[in-house]
A protein has these predicted regions:
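…; additionally, a secondary subgroup of soluble metalloenzymes is captured
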Residues: 1-302
Length: 302
């Protein structure tokens, strides 16, 4: 599977942004219970499948002339000690408004029972980063006033962190300040709807944070790097597919694999294509010309 972008143009025709990235919807279903899946992957906690859980993430909002842009977490270099310090400052406010204790603190992700915020419509940082946050802020769904309550808590934390020594030290080192808190992924494990193809998978490959929790939920072994000696009945979420295509091509030609199913998301829509060894060398219409090998560039551009 290769990551795709949301159908943003289609979304702009509506009042609300697209719900989730296509790969998020493909793996987890339309309810998008990202937070409990991340929690399952990052901790040894026994996660209640019927408990709505939220993911809170310390972030940097970059100010332009007329709007704010959410930076990706990979761009802010938040350390474990900084994460602990920032949570300690914000914890009383978070737990008071959520009416729950924080369940688990990772370096980048904090998890808590969603409580009164369970009905919020949210978007992951993967989807919202690099964009004007006005359109991607949490919205009310079936309960009015919840988004306003979140903005109040968010503003309180922003003021606390603005004067926090963590940000003073980061500024001295030339790092972006941690100036806001993002909420996303609200849902229950019971809401997961995995694709049928995972029913026959014996191994999951990839380093996306969602995979560790999803593999644990499905009781399927998972590892970050692909073991090319173990490719049959496997699922891989690949960031740089061009870097492994030659290995996969060799596995098909060597009959180590019968077929490869490529899943991608052109214009936000799920596309499945199956390739066998017969597809690897397409004969030109000019029969006297040598057949050309199927490259990843040809696959992804078709």
């Amino acid at each position: 599977m290769v990551s795709g972008e949301d159908a943003i143009d289609a979304g702009l025709e509506r009042d609300t942004p697209p719900s989730g990235l296509p790969q998020e919807r493909f793996l987890l279903g339309d309810q998008l219970p990202i937070a409990p899946v991340l929690l399952l992957g990052q901790s040894d906690l026994a996660v209640n499948p019927n408990e709505a859980i939220a993911c809170l993430q310390p972030v940097h909002l970059h100010a332009t002339r007329d709007h704010l842009i959410l930076m990706a977490q990979s761009q802010i270099d938040l350390t474990a000690s900084e994460s602990v310090s920032l949570l300690q400052v914000a914890l009383p406010f978070i737990e008071e408004d959520f009416r729950n204790k924080v369940l688990f603190q990772g370096q980048r992700d904090w998890f808590i029972s969603a409580g009164p915020f369970a009905s919020l419509a949210t978007h992951s940082i993967d989807q919202a980063h690099g964009r004007n946050i006005d359109w991607w802020m949490p919205r009310d769904t079936n309960v009015t006033g919840v988004a306003k309550l979140w903005r109040k808590l968010q503003n309180e934390i922003q003021m606390l962190w603005h004067i926090d020594p963590v940000n003073q030290e980061r500024e001295q080192r030339g790092y972006p300040s941690i100036n806001s808190l993002w909420i996303s992924g609200i849902g229950k494990l019971a809401d997961i709807q995995t694709p049928p193809l995972l029913e026959n998978v014996d191994q999951i490959y990839g380093d996306h944070p969602l995979l560790a929790g999803l593999a644990k939920y499905l009781a399927i072994p998972q590892q970050r790097e692909i073991d090319f000696s173990n490719l049959q009945n496997t699922f891989a979420w690949i960031d740089r597919p061009e870097s492994i295509w030659d290995n996969l091509r060799a596995a098909l030609l060597g009959n180590e694999l019968d077929e490869i199913e490529v899943i991608d998301f052109p214009k936000g829509q799920t596309r499945h294509r199956i390739f066998t060894s017969k597809d690897l060398n397409k004969q030109s219409w000019a029969f006297w010309k040598k057949s050309e090998p199927l490259t990843w560039q040809k696959i992804i551009s078709s």
